[in-house]
Amino acid sequence: MLARIVTLSASALAIIGTAANPANAQSHATPELVLTATNASPNTLLVYDPSGNLLQSIATHGHGGVSGNAGGIAKHRGQVAVVNFGSSDVSVFDLGTDGRRLHLQDLVPAVSNPVSVAFGYNHLYILSTTSVESHWVSPAGVDPQPDGTATLLHADGSAGQVGVVTGQLVITEKSNAIESVALTADGAVTGNANLVSDIPANVNTPLGLATRGNDAYVTIAHANEISLVRDDAVLTTTPSVTQHAPCWLALDGPFLFSANSPSLSVSRYAVYGQHIIQDAAVAATFEGDPTDIAYGAGRLGVIDSDGTNSHLSIFKVDEDGNLTLGDVVTFTGVVSTNGVVIITSDEGLAR
């Protein structure tokens, strides 16, 4: 197993310039770009190829500082959104005509400090510490004015992640709420946030989620569980067994991968119907605590931090869900790298 280590210092990150609907549908797409953000002040979007070579380092023109979140970066049809927690806005980037180079398109103000973003129904959804809001997306960019907002049930700063399912949003608040918000026919947020039913009695820190169609898989991190939410109700809950605090999720066809922070690992589950079955307790291990995970076109990207440095690990995923480590990028002196997405070749062409 070959792993090439690329080391970047915190000071180098600041000066590096440009170098020489459901996301889980199966296709012939190939991975093109792997993205993460420094989450520093100022914040920077880092763009790599699947081999871990730095292609671009782009200022978001905002400030980072988010923690305890999931989905800090989102992508859809060549657009990429990045949360800037410290400056209460979201940077939106657009792929150029070659489908491989990003440029800043919009800086969208948020109602409060943003923690998570998602695309769907021609909208950008921004989850902040107290609310969720929708912004219309067009080829010209993202409307800076929200066309819908809803206050979270707790609105206590514990918001974790937002995801899009059929006709609504699913949201986590770490203060033990899994909630939904309805969308209009055009995709705008409408009405109030509602607590989903049948949440396990031992609920403790809902955090990350992954969505597909009408299903949302949600981690209940400190209860060591993963739940399936459908139609405003929890249908199934599965324990993570030997691995503790599953916090972040990524879907790959029949496989669901969880990043387990204190266990320094990724687990693999088989998911179908209402079933969540642990297939491999430990599919991969890391030097630090994982802080996010993403899948795209046969690649899995995982961010981790060991308290001194952050790392981006890029795995190949075979048809059986087995992970083979390809490259590891080390961010020397950068401890809070946040968010990861993988841009595929078909997304680059969907301009």
Where does each model-flagged region fall?
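An edge-strand/N-cap motif at the start of beta-rich repeat modules
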Residues: 26-53
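Beta-rich, blade/repeat-based domains predominating
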Residues: 29, 61-77, 108-123, 151-168, ...
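Conserved beta-strand positions in repeat-built beta-propeller and related beta-rich domains
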Residues: 36-40, 82-86, 126-130, 171-175, ...
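Structural signal for beta-propeller blades
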Residues: 42-45, 88-90, 132-134, 177-179, ...
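Short loop/turn segments immediately following beta-strands, especially the blade-tip
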Residues: 49-53, 93-100, 136-144, 180-190, ...
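Beta-propeller fold detector
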Residues: 54-62, 101-109, 143-153, 190-199, ...
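Aromatic- and glycine-enriched pocket-lining scaffold segments that form the walls
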Residues: 126-136, 144-186, 192-194
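Blade-level signature of beta-propeller repeat domains, shared across WD40, Kelch, NHL, RCC1
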Residues: 305-351
